[in-house]
């Protein structure tokens, strides 16, 4: 067999086992062929398709970055049990996957990357698309994958394939180590012959690890939770990937502890659950943020504690706050200097905590506070969803209309711009897999490709749930090429393009930091009104609806009239009923914002400026920054079974 043939057949025989679930670890390959892989990986895929049809399906992609996004979208829908391989040619084909690799690793989601590499023999150096560095002849562009991958290796000799492939799969299915896994394949080595042991090609099962909490760590966590007066749970993506949403629901119903979710943790509890207060942090709800600010114990479950979750370390203001961090990854479990890490599976740990803790831990006063904050925020969202009758509605109205049109099991997909923040505050999640916002790397262009991957994941599970992609014009222009794949494979998506003629999110941020929305509006060069008046500005004559229609998709354009929201609702109903993909285009007013959730995000403002707007922003920034805390540990003593002590700020 050739090296490529052996690798492809090896991948076809890998299985992930998670309890009663058994599925192919690599159910298919995305690819774009070039001279670096058409005779290697390309030939191997064709040969296996002839010999064993359907065992390793090949899906033609249009952009290499988008291949990885599809893999991540699929992996998220399958709770990290499965992902696709992405095969790219040498040079620019390979480097196009770098952004996707970073996204996968940042999100702790598996993706297998197979970039072609230059000749191992160097017999034809420099080959087409090869980068040369005089100070290191052995360097190739694929070395750029090293800091972006959780595992990287290069098959320099055929005999290396066996150990590399097994180790790659080991990392891919490990919940604590997973991310981008990269195997660089020199184009000459791909086609070399090798004697392959039958054991290498035999079916192999990878049983997902569900590590139990250590007794000592669990006992310390239990003591801290018992002693806490105002505990608060931050539910992260680990709750979803562990399948622990049922255990979380039972735990909070028993104890009364309130929950705020990260972006990845959306779906950990249904929006209308009594203990669920919505998103927490910079884009969170006022309900979650007010309770988080007063919490004396934060129980982080499967969270990375990004700056958006912690409000750039302003969210947790109790002087003696402590953290019980439950995570399969020690790196995340030890964050915020906690002395109470629980390095274990979320589902197993919640089961153990439920068995060790009594019912109804929180006081009546605290429970009433939780209920009151929830009622207030729910009413705020209701108000945000009320149609304004404007020709160009605000984004919150659009979100509310999409929400009303979807079924509970449908999936909303987003990643970048102002939509993630609005969705985190406003979207009412009704299914553990229904909220799919990529906000670890927050990559413009993820939406359509990631949505396609999510839909593949749903179809593979036999689900007919609709996947609704909401995308701004900025992200659409960045990467919409996988619409061709949607059409080619007849996969149904509902795509809502929200056009605000610029980078609305960064425009708002620019105004906040005193940069006056400079460079954030889509206008003809040279006639932007930087004073914000819009006087004399000409919009770019780009017709995104026509562009989408050119792919062969059904397209509905919502005219800017007072009935725009009603028209959007009707278009969504028709799209839901249709078996085909539908793109719905609507214009929005970028200056109509979602309600304030009282979170903060640290974006530094210049200390010196001649612009009055920047000087004002700097004063505001300095005031907000005073709430930041280092969170290095030792703030309280709950873990030892004592009561929170006062912190005089002396550091003693």
Predicted regions: what they are:
Residues 7, 29-41, 374-461:
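Active-site diphosphate/adenylate-binding microenvironment
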Residues 61, 155, 262, 415, ...:
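Conserved beta-strand termini and adjacent loop/short-helix elements that scaffold enzyme active sites
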Residues 235-237, 301, 416, 471-474:
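Glycine-rich beta-strand-to-loop/alpha-helix junction loops that act as flexible
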Residues 161, 364-379:
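Internal, active-site/partner-interface "lid" segment
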Residues 182-191, 370-377, 589-592:
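A short, charged, Gly/Pro-tolerant segment at domain boundaries
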Residues 1-361, 401, 405-408, 464, ...:
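N-terminal alpha/beta PP-like core and its mobile active-site loop of ThDP/TPP-dependent enzymes
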Residues 147-152, 204, 376-389, 529-530:
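Short glycine/proline- and acidic residue-enriched helix-loop micro-motifs
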Residues 122-135, 289, 333-334, 341-343, ...:
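Thiamine diphosphate
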């Amino acid at each position: 067999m050739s090296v490529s043939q052996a690798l492809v057949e090896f991948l076809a025989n890998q299985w992930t086992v998670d309890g009663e679930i058994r599925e192919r670890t690599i159910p298919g390959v995305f690819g774009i062929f070039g001279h670096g892989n058409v005779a290697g990986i390309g030939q191997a895929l064709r040969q296996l398709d002839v010999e064993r049809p359907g065992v390793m399906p090949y899906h033609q992609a249009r952009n290499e970055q988008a291949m990885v996004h599809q893999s991540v979208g699929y992996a998220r829908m399958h709770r990290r049990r499965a992902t696709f391989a992405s095969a790219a040619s040498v040079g620019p084909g390979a480097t196009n996957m770098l952004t996707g690799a970073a996204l996968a690793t940042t999100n702790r989601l598996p993706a297998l990357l197979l970039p072609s590499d230059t000749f191992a023999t160097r017999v034809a150096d420099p080959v087409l698309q090869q980068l040369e560095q005089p100070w290191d002849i052995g360097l190739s562009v694929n070395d750029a994958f090293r800091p972006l991958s959780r595992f990287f290796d290069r098959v320099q000799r055929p005999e290396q394939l066996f150990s590399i492939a097994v180790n790659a799969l080991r990392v891919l299915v490990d919940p604590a180590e997973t991310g981008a896994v990269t195997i660089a394949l020199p184009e000459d080595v791909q086609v070399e012959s090798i004697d392959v042991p039958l054991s290498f090609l035999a079916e192999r099962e990878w049983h997902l690890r569900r590590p139990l909490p250590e007794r000592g760590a669990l006992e310390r966590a239990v003591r801290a939770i018992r002693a806490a007066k105002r505990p608060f749970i931050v539910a992260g993506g680990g709750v979803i990937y562990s399948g622990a949403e049922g255990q979380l629901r039972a735990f909070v119903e028993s104890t009364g502890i309130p929950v705020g979710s990260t972006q990845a943790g959306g779906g950990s509890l249904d929006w209308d659950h009594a203990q669920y207060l919505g998103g927490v942090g910079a884009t969170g709800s006022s309900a979650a943020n007010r309770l988080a600010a007063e919490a004396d114990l934060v129980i982080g479950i499967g969270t990375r504690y990004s700056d958006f979750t912690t409000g750039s370390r302003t969210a947790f203001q109790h002087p003696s706050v402590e953290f019980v961090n439950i995570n399969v990854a020690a790196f995340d479990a030890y964050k915020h200097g906690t002395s109470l890490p629980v390095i274990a599976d979320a589902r197993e740990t919640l089961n153990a905590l439920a068995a060790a803790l009594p019912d109804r831990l929180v006081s009546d006063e605290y429970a009433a506070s939780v209920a009151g904050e929830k009622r207030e925020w729910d009413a705020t969202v209701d108000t945000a969803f009320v149609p304004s009758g404007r020709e160009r509605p605000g984004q919150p109205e659009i979100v509310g209309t999409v929400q009303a049109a979807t079924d509970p099991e449908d999936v909303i997909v987003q990643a970048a711009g102002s939509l993630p923040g609005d969705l985190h505050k406003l979207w009412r999640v009704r299914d553990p897999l229904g909220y799919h916002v990529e906000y670890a790397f927050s990559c413009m262009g993820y939406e359509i490709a990631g949505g396609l991957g999510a839909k593949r994941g749903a179809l593979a599970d036999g689900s007919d749930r609709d996947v609704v992609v909401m995308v701004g014009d900025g992200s659409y222009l960045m990467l919409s090429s996988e619409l061709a794949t949607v059409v080619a494979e007849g996969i149904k998506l509902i795509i809502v393009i929200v056009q605000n003629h610029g980078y609305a999110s960064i425009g708002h941020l620019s105004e906040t930091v005193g940069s006056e929305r400079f460079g954030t509006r889509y206008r003809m060069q040279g006639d932007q009104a930087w004073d914000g008046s819009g006087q004399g500005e000409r919009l770019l004559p780009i017709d995104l609806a026509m562009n989408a229609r050119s792919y062969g998709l059904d397209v509905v354009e919502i005219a800017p009239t007072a009935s725009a929201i009603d028209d959007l609702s009707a278009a969504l109903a028709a799209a839901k009923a249709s078996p085909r993909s539908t793109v719905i285009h609507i214009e929005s007013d970028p200056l109509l914002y979602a309600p304030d959730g009282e979170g903060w995000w640290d974006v530094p403002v210049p200390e010196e400026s001649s612009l009055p707007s920047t000087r004002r922003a700097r004063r505001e920034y300095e005031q907000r920054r005073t709430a930041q805390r280092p969170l290095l540990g030792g703030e309280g003593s709950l873990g030892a079974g004592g009561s929170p002590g006062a912190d005089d700020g002396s550091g003693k």
